């Protein structure tokens, strides 16, 4: 039926209901959705009348009749509703088999846009945000019913987010989880886990009466000493000489402002106090969080939004934002964490901190060195924020370090040079992943080169870059020699540098790990030998697990139970332990990956996390989540929050969904790889 005929047919059928339409308030008020719903109701009434006289209405009326029922079925099966607005539009393009033509109807007039059908690209937030329950998990929520599906769907599946999250069979194994209490801890360290407790930030328009107060000089000296010894070496931001000069003036003349931006400097000082308080691991939990949060709230009030957005930028403003961002990183303020990092990066760029030579700018060599130091910290901060929050980091031009030998560089210059080179490799890794996840890249990809093959080609070159970086490290910087470094600050710097290097390796190999676990175990026929692509995929997954093992080993080396302050900040230790633990959970699905060595590394991660339970309530929740997920895979009794055991879980061979396991720790492998907008990985 043509569009014009359809319109006349509708008018003739509804003409008899003109009086009811005129009296309908929704129709008179111009509500399109309600009016469309009313029209469908009229069509259903006509449908019932026509059925009595054995007359048949056009096919689309029958679809309207079954709209809500079909939506319920599609929702239960986890598929996009075939009767949704977007799906109907697609059906008008593809002709069904066995029909010469299909009826093309004006969809907006027939299907009320009451609710959009679930998108295949992004799962509904309500589903992604809540852990699965026994009754809410379907038996099979990924059944390909499209007879014209792409033949290479399985091949590119792990590299294309449009196909949604990984699907798997849940079958009878889900019924055996009837007594399971779903994990309520979906938070991730340095993402949204409140490691520093609940931080309530006051409105910046409401100044705190104590915002300009300073602690007693003796206690302040103690906190300043802790910061320079145990916080600044990890990520240097401030110039020590300038900071100490202003610090002395603040206590010698506390009433007279030191400079025009006195409030800004007080904000820096209060964040320094807050980080130093959190660094003391032996202090009682509630006392530490309460005191540190009070210092941070003072700094927050002292830095109003107008000073960040509309006033000219300064190095002090960038430094204050970076310090604030470090603290916010360990709270549940994701939006403020992401925003402060972006502001610091943009303001630093506006000041040309990213340029090695700025002949038009006046300033001493010390100012230029400080700008380069701040810019290097900005890049490191942006990388940490973006990879942990699952956002795309800024692909900025990083100045090339001077081509000097290790003997010609000092210790600090060597650390900065290695850091800049590593950040540049990280830029290339992320760029390769972004290029592979865009539709534009797929359009210009050679016909015989799949998304998987293209990323594998890039990964080979990037792996060589990482290997060259590791080979360029002097012998006394190698991991095997780190324990022999006598200077505590230097040893901490080198440990953190190697942890970041291993993080880059995990970030590079994780797409292949995701692809490896998306493949069904029986996809390879028994009578055929594994292909080269399959072997490379398996080897890449093994290298990802090996990097996670090295992360766990390095973190355990830094543990010093007898020291009041650990070698590395305790929030970084929890962060990297969480990364390693998630990869070990993935290894449990494959016997060729979860070897005895990996099992020992898994146990070391659990022991290390138990040693951090006194530092944050989140650690106990993380432990319980890891133990529960491991029990689901291995079939051992899973624990409860009170320490008791629960029923038995089944092993991975019985059809437990891989994504169903990892959604409880907010870990979406598919979104992490190549999401349409963000990476979407909670762990990185």
UniProtKB/Swiss-Prot annotation:
Gene Ontology cellular component annotations, sorted alphabetically: nucleus
One Pfam family it belongs to: Fungal_trans
Disrupted gene: phenotype observed: Has low impact on expression of the sorbicillin biosynthesis gene cluster but, except for very low levels of dihydrosorbicillinol, impairs the production of sorbicillinoids.
GO annotation terms (biological process): DNA-templated transcription; positive regulation of transcription from RNA polymerase II promoter by galactose
A GO term, aspect molecular function: zinc ion binding
SMART domains reported in the protein's UniProt record: Fungal_trans (SM00906)
Spans annotated as Disordered: 114-151
Subcellular location: Nucleus
Keywords (A to Z) from UniProt: DNA-binding, Nucleus, Transcription, Transcription regulation
Keyword Transcription regulation carried by entry: yes
InterPro entries, sorted: Fungal_SecMet_Regulators (IPR051127), Transcription_factor_dom_fun (IPR007219)
Primary site of residence: nucleus
Cited function: Transcription factor that acts in concert with sorR1 which is a transcriptional activator of the gene cluster that mediates the biosynthesis of sorbicillinoids, a diverse group of yellow secondary metabolites that restrict growth of competing pathogenic fungi but not of bacteria.
Protein name per UniProt: Sorbicillinoid biosynthetic cluster transcription factor 2
Species annotation: Penicillium rubens (strain ATCC 28089 / DSM 1075 / NRRL 1951 / Wisconsin 54-1255) (Penicillium chrysogenum)
Taxonomic lineage of the native organism: Eukaryota, Fungi, Dikarya, Ascomycota, Pezizomycotina
